[in-house]
Amino acid sequence: MTSIRVAFSRASSAASAVAEIAGQMAGFRPALVLCFAADAQDPAQLAAALRQAFPPPVALAGCTTAGEIGPDGYTNDSVVAIGFAAADFTAATVLIPGLSAFDLADCQRRVEDTLHRSTLQREALGFPNSLAFLLVDGLSLREEPVGRAVQLVLGDIPVVGGSAGDSLHFRQTQVFHDGSAQSDAAVLALISTDLPFRVVKTQHFQRTDERMVVTGARPAERVVTEINGFPAALEYARIVGVPVANLDPMAFAAYPVVVRIGGSEYVRSIQKVNPDHSLSFYCAIDEGIVLSRAQGLDALANLESALARVEEEIG
């Protein structure tokens, strides 16, 4: 029996999707089920159905998405569930609500309590390895402060995760936690295991020498108003060679920008062009940041190379 099982459904109703997922996990006893779902299904109904299909002590976490990875690769309008076998994993989860009025002390208290529960589980079973999985409401604009708060408590425990989406509608993104779906919230799963693992970070982009200095911004809104002293969208369009009218999600994906931090490069994803020719970003941005135009590499080859290195390390 494998330690991790993936289930997939394209059913249009939450009940049918969860029934298919439960069927694909028949005979598999999970400690944790992570669920990623398009907003075609009702999130509240989906979360409730998952709890009915996987009752306690199974831990549940997940979020709505802007696309999923299914058996045939990238897809949309589907539900993906990942089960972690109880024989090899333990999991403790916690909801971090009220992100619009983010309370650092409350967040850290919740994480500390969850870390205590996770430590008791891990020590009882003798599992030596731990990681944290964090999902944040993608419209809350709170990924960075939540991530920092979590990492401060967890110390050397690696934190991975991302933002909830809603098929690029930008109306309501939700996280799942133990049978409920909530906006303005984050969910954290602390996972321990006796299996070896590595955290893998890949991005199929390479920095060029063409730079863009953020000379005007509204950091609280993640909006860049000026690049190199010119209206942001106009200057970005000039540099990448795309008409402003053609700047859409596909163009932003084809012509990404990166920032260099601590010797590593990180993509700063652009969301949209605003009527005043400013640019909205998906992540933290501020005046003075130097962005570089990046060029795309072979995504599949990049991923295969990264996984091959991990296989060499841990077998």
Predicted regions and their residues:
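Small-residue-enriched flexible segments
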Residues: M1-L32, F36-A53, P57-A66, P71-G315
